[in-house]
Structures are given as structure tokens and as C-alpha cells.
Amino acid sequence: MTNAEIAAALEELGTLYERDGADRYRVRAYRTAARAIRDCPDSVAELAAAGRVKEIPGIGKTLEEKILTLLETGDIPSAVKLRGKLPAATAELDSFLAENPGEGLVELSDIRGDLHSHTTLSDGRNTLEEMAAAAQKRGYAYLAIPDHSASHGFGDNVTAERLWGRIEEIRAWNEDRRGFRLLAGSEVNIGTDGSLDYPEDLLAELDWVIASVHTSFSISEERMTSRIVTAIENPHVDCIGHLTGRLIGRREPYAVDVEAVVAAAAQSGTMLEINGNPNRRDLKEEHARLAADAGIPVVLNTDAHGIETLDNMSYAAIVARGAGLTPDDVANTRSWGDFSRLIKR
């Protein structure tokens, strides 16, 4: 077995763990090991046979055992188990779209851009350039890069100074491109009082602001609702991300008056997203329908933290179709020119 094949197996295992909701450090360990094996100048199979595989940086006892099993059997038991658990869901996406044509409902082919992705500037795994290239391969016309703001509690701390630098970087990138646009953005954490991380002058310079709750989930429904409505009323907030904060099977939605939030969003012209992270799928169908009925443009997003999770758009589409959304209900079925008119700036 070649180094590339071993690396691919560990890379796949990392992705499977990620989609199963594993701790990000565990996922990162497999991806780091995969890179080390891919870059190793010696045959990893020969090193393993000689009992020297742990000489490779990042390879400890657990990974050594998985590599030895892979070399002996051609697969890794934990990967087999996860494939049996997850692709049932992955295959379900394709079969659902095929078996439920739902005349007039939104389809993946209608999507023109993704408005929620992350890069190495915060807690993503790929660079801005890599994410842009992957989005272009999917036929998108635009991609927003709203890396996490300073107080979200994980990943790198994107200070105001670093965000100004990212704005300049994206503006320069767009100058040399035609037919595809990157949006300089931020996924800004909403404080318990509805305040946002960055000063107003910085928020005003961004192309796209998505505001989300990442902290203090246990406050009362009244306070949580006021918190989110205050963010919605900010003239620089274009969209609210993963509205109820749920992580399926791991964390219940926090207490929030969704109807009140929808009413405020409709009043202020703020979009709401269907977050396609398979562990979120938030808005759920009922809430997506409520938003569409209120005239709110719903955004189908991936919350991608790497190029492979740009595929999360399928999960968002499943929810949208289950809610009966048409292309007209979905903001990012529009061309860049038409979509840009929905942005508050």
C-alpha cells in the first residue's frame, strides 16, 4: 500500500469523524497524520513492518494500530463503522432529491453562492484561495468568507486589525477576477445584550455580516429573544446564523421565541439561514417555512470549515425542500447582482 493510499484512508477517517460530530482536535489529528504520511520520503508500509511507524511526526500508538490494521486488512474498523452510520444519511440526500422531485421546489442546481464558510484565518482548514477555487468548481458565482469574530470562544482570535487586513486582501483578490466574487465578511458573535464584537465603522466596511449566538446558551427565553432581535435591528447585520443553536443529538435548542425573531427579521430586512452542517440543520423545516411565509429571504449555507464540507449544501437543500421552499424563497439562488440588493449596505 502506498503512502498516498494510507494518507487517503486517514483523511477519510477524519472526515467521517467530523461528520459524526467528533471533537475537532480528534479530526485534526487524523488530518495532520495524513499530511505527514503523504510527505514522508520513506515507505510507511516498510516503516510499519519494521516497527518504526511512530517515527513519523504525529503518529502515536493509536494511529500506529490503525495503520497496521489498514495494511493487514485493507481497511480501518472505525471507518467501516462510520461509513455504515453516515453514508446512509449521505446517500439519503441524493435519493431524497431524486425521489421527491417536488415540482417547483428549490434544487441544488439553483444555488449560485455560499454565504457561510470559514478559512484558516479563524478555525477553518483551508485558505481563502483554496475555498474560492473549490466554490468556483461548484459553479458558484460568489462566496462569502465570514470567519469567526473575536469572542466566539474557539479557533484563532480575529482581531479588528486582522479583519481589516482580510478586507483589503479580498478587495485585491476581486480586482483580478471576473465572473466570481468573494465577499469579505464576519460571523460575529452576539453578546448577551445583543452587542457585536466589532465597532460599527468596521462592520460597515464588510460585504456580509452574519450574526450568531456562540456563548451563554442558558439565559432565559426572554433575554435570548431580545439578544437576537437587537442584533437583527443592527443596520450592518445581513443574516442570523443557526438560529436555535441546536446540535442534533448533542445539544438541545436554546430557549428563543422564533416567531418574534421572524417578525423582527421581516421588519428589518434581515435574512435567516438554513445551516447545512449535518449536526445543525438549523433552521428546521417548520422555522424555514415560517420565515418564507413572512417574506424573509432564506439563505442556504454550508458553514463549511474546509473544502470537503462545502458539500453540506445538500443538507440545507433537504431542509428547504422539506419546508416547501421554491427558488424564489431562497436568497442565494439569485445572481450576484440580484443578491447584492438584499444586503443591507
Where are these regions (language model features)?
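Short, compositionally biased low-complexity segments
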Residues: 3-6, 138-145
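Ser/Thr-glycine-rich phosphate-binding loops at phosphate-binding pockets of nucleotides
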Residues: 115-121, 142-146
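Positively charged, glycine-rich low-complexity segments
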Residues: 125
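Long, highly charged, low-complexity intrinsically disordered interaction regions
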Residues: 1-106
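Charged catalytic cores and adjacent phosphate/nucleic-acid-binding surfaces used
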Residues: 2, 33, 42, 54, ...
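Core AdoMet radical
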Residues: 144-145, 186-188
